[in-house]
């Protein structure tokens, strides 16, 4: 199959609302267009199922390297997803019921031979906070619970704890409770919806002052540089969405050890684009839904991470 004949669909948040300067999906689309791919644009609610086949309202998409005008969309048509070669599922979390339904619909296209990145089974299995817990040797002490007594006992044991929801992104809903335990009851009540929802508590890692580092794996292979996301003053969240700044750095020996721990399972699940979040010596999250930070690393290091991903896609489709 020649590159020029490849039809790539993307399911994403509204393209009009993306951050032109740092959007990873846009970088992927530029790279695909430059290789001669035909681009097809979809939002999550464009997907539908009829008589056991997955369809979507698709619009032809052209992307531009122009901060004032970065895309053009053609006329919408309803077409089977099976007409596409590959679909990039780039809808940002939260992983709510609608996200899960969309992934199930993409699974019907997968069964008809469409390559979905990342694979639908892996998207359904790999909660970004919980997936990392399959590698306890790589993680800081952690508990997942909805019960007030379990969460309080964990705080009493560790003294300095981060509480966070299991389905957030960009640093939303994260609380740091110090040894004095101020507001712990209110935080647990708010995050667990009074005991109705599981949340994560993790021992606070002082290394966050140096930022957390995003490490990208493309088809199981690490990009040689990570992005340290350094919190703004007084923040405990390094996420760029929470005001952190991104500084690219080479991977450390410990980073490579962490990667080696997770690589076999990432390859086994067919995950083609994954972001590890590392604080100090520990993995805190394994992002599989819509990993970012490509633009910042490419800009600072001259890498072509989208090109690496497209090479991997072409190998799968060959």
Residue ranges and their predicted role:
Residues 5, 16-144:
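Conserved N-proximal alpha/beta basic substrate-recognition cap immediately N-terminal to
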Residues 33, 110, 155-156, 267:
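Anion (oxyanion) recognition and catalysis
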Residues 10, 88-89, 202:
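Redox-cofactor binding/interface segments in oxidoreductases and associated redox assembly factors
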Residues 149, 156-160, 167-256:
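Phosphate-binding site of ATP-dependent enzymes
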Residues 120-123, 229-231, 279-282:
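Short glycine-enriched loops at secondary-structure junctions
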Residues 40, 116-117, 162, 200-202:
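Structural detector of well-ordered beta-strand residues that form the stable sheet scaffold
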